[in-house]
Amino acid sequence: MSKKPMQKFMDWLQYKVTPAVQKFTERPWVHGFSAGIVKCLPFILTGCLIFFYNVVQPYFPNILPNLSAVSNYTFSMLSLLVAFMMVYQEMGSLKHRNYQVVGGLTGICAYILAMKGTTVDGVYSVTWNRFGPTGIVVAICIGLYVSIIFHLIAKLNLFKNNNTIPEFVQEWIKNIIPIFLSILLLKIVIIDLDVDLYPICLLYTSPSPRDRSLSR
């Protein structure tokens, strides 16, 4: 007796799709990417909690304090957090644990550079919403870019058979090279070529006019 269509479909999901998806998600780059996003979820949920709180707060202004600042410095910092955590988790998944913190901090520096802030009379100004969810696609791209630079340098195995240079000096050089390259290459794109990544990412991630008309 042949299996019912639904049973065939369930078997296909269980024995074909599930193993393929599991194998895909176990790849170091994919695992690091997903882990970087998951680690930022508590900050997203904190912001959501404040949004719900702000619905109730205006009805009891004399009792409940305004907690918008909590959301501003958690959820509204999401892109900055992603820029750090993306590199941190990728370095862990790729077995470059000595680069996790330095790589993550470089991700933050690179993301701030990509924000294209302006300095006037010693005052640095940048669009506030670029810290938050608005810039998350740019933050992911920056995180992956920095991860690639650090991964390529790590694969060179600098000073592998060198015992003459002190170990702490070796660590300095191993860190300086990927930091320098990450910021230098991005500086050429952002400052010298005057490229703003935000409109580019928005162009490719926002729905097309046709999609918007269909959703109405």
Which residues does each PLM region occupy?
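Cytosolic juxtamembrane amphipathic/interface segments immediately preceding
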Residues: 16-34, 162-170
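Conserved small/polar residues in nucleotide/adenosyl-binding loops
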Residues: 204-211
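Short, Lys/Arg-rich, polar N-terminal cytosolic tail immediately upstream
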Residues: 1-24
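Conserved, well-structured core segments that form the ligand-binding/active-site neighborhood
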Residues: 151, 167-175, 187
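Selective recognition of specific alpha-helical transmembrane segments in multi-pass small-molecule
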Residues: 175-190, 206, 216
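Early transmembrane hairpin of solute transport permeases
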Residues: 22-157
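Juxtamembrane interface elements at the cytosolic ends of transmembrane helices
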Residues: 145-162, 189-201
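Small-residue-rich segments of transmembrane alpha-helices in multi-pass membrane proteins
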Residues: 108-112, 171-180
